[in-house]
Design a protein with these regions (language model features):
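Basic nucleic-acid-binding interfaces
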Residues: 116-138, 143-171, 214-216
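UBC/E2-like fold recognition across ubiquitin and ubiquitin-like conjugation systems
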Residues: 1-130, 209-216
Length: 216
């Protein structure tokens, strides 16, 4: 198990779409490639206020969002790449994700200007265009393979909310988990009391004992 704590934020905006998720993944990848993180071997000692990557049987990003020094939200999503912290190698299916490949993926995202094309064909065409424009045609296949994964992997989105403003009894509890981000699939699980990043990690950790829901 490795805990990689980032000293800089990896999410500049709320996560409301797959495009937002991809941006977070690519920003975290940037920091991993450039070694802009600290390694923590004891989760009890990790800074609750900083985003971190938990790497073990599961690989998940945990991203707290603070207002006036108080954590009001904690986002967690699956991290789809493999990272060897000892060798400083970021990869996907034996494809080495280096600065040039990650930069190409960021360029593709920026070209979309906030909206993904409707078809996979248009997306992949843009991947090839970016590689050709940057004299990186030799990385076309790698870019397409990694970007296809980003477009299709199971995001595993969970968000903890401390939401006093919209509190409405049991319909919208002050403390709750939002599962999934789209309006069609999201739902809430109410919490009796607030939790921190470590508690959310424990709830989602597949190597720890399960947590149980208790009906009212």
């Amino acid at each position: 198990m490795k805990l990689l704590s980032f000293t800089r934020n990896i999410a500049s905006n709320a996560i409301r779409s797959r495009l937002d998720v991809i941006k977070v993944i690519l920003q975290a990848s940037d920091y991993l490639i450039d070694k802009q993180y600290s390694v923590c071997h004891n989760i009890e000692k990790i800074d609750n206020n900083q985003p971190f990557l938990y790497v073990d049987k599961m690989s998940r990003l945990f991203i707290p969002e603070k207002t006036a020094g108080e954590i009001l939200k904690i986002y967690s999503i699956v991290f789809p790449f493999s990272y060897n912290a000892d060798q400083h190698v970021l990869s996907f299916n034996q494809i080495n994700i280096n600065n040039s490949l990650n930069s190409c993926m960021k360029t593709v995202i920026n070209v979309f200007d906030g909206v993904l094309p409707e078809t996979m064909e248009k997306i992949l065409d843009r991947c090839w265009d970016v590689c050709n424009d940057n004299d990186l045609s030799y990385q076309q296949d790698d870019l397409v393979a990694v970007f296809t994964e980003l477009l299709t992997f199971d995001i595993g989105y969970v968000r903890y909310d401390y939401d006093k403003e919209h509190q409405n009894g049991d319909m919208h509890p002050t403390y709750h988990l939002d599962i999934n981000y789209s309006n069609q699939s999201t739902y809430k699980i109410g919490l009796i009391q607030p939790i921190d990043t470590l508690r959310l990690e424990a709830i989602l950790d597949t190597k720890q004992e399960c947590w149980f829901l208790k009906a009212n």
